[in-house]
UniProtKB/Swiss-Prot annotation:
Pfam families: DUF1358. Belongs to the TMEM242 family. PANTHER family: TRANSMEMBRANE PROTEIN 242. This is Transmembrane protein 242. Signal peptide: none annotated. It comes from Homo sapiens.
Length: 141
């Protein structure tokens, strides 16, 4: 018994479809983009949390990295705690923003999202010229 896709000459599996390479590349690029945004958010959250901790108790923050009787928490453990909270805020913030944009656009799949973004933003012109030859560009005259 043949599958439904075999009668038309098309593969039965969606992973073997001709456009699947482009879809997979799109998903990888999207993942890299979201990872970069998340990393930037984590860095911003870490810096913000660290600056708030320094503002709240600067004398404890500026003392050494060893915990003493006067300092119940070392600077490194304070920084790790700030990193943890900053990371949590960054991941939650990116998730909430992504979810809000997804719902505001009313899309149901990545293909819908891509077509919606292409309709909103202008197209990027492709350069038909070859890549810049740096040796010619940087050659002294």
């Amino acid at each position: 018994m043949e599958t439904a896709g075999a009668a038309t000459g098309q593969p039965a599996s969606g992973l073997e479809a001709p456009g699947s390479t482009n879809d997979r590349l799109f998903l990888v690029k999207g993942g890299i983009f979201l990872g970069t945004v998340a990393a930037a958010g984590m860095l911003a959250g870490f810096i913000t949390t660290l600056s708030l901790a320094k503002k709240k108790s600067p004398e404890w923050f500026n003392k050494g990295s060893m915990a003493t009787a006067a300092l119940p928490e070392s600077g490194s453990s304070l920084a790790l705690r700030a990193l943890g909270w900053g990371s949590l805020y960054a991941w939650c913030g990116v998730g909430v923003i992504s979810f809000a944009v997804w719902k505001a656009l009313g899309v149901h799949s990545m293909n819908d999202f891509r077509s919606k973004m292409q309709s909103i933003f202008p197209t990027i012109p492709k350069n038909s010229e070859s890549a810049v030859e740096w040796e010619e560009t940087l050659k002294s005259k």
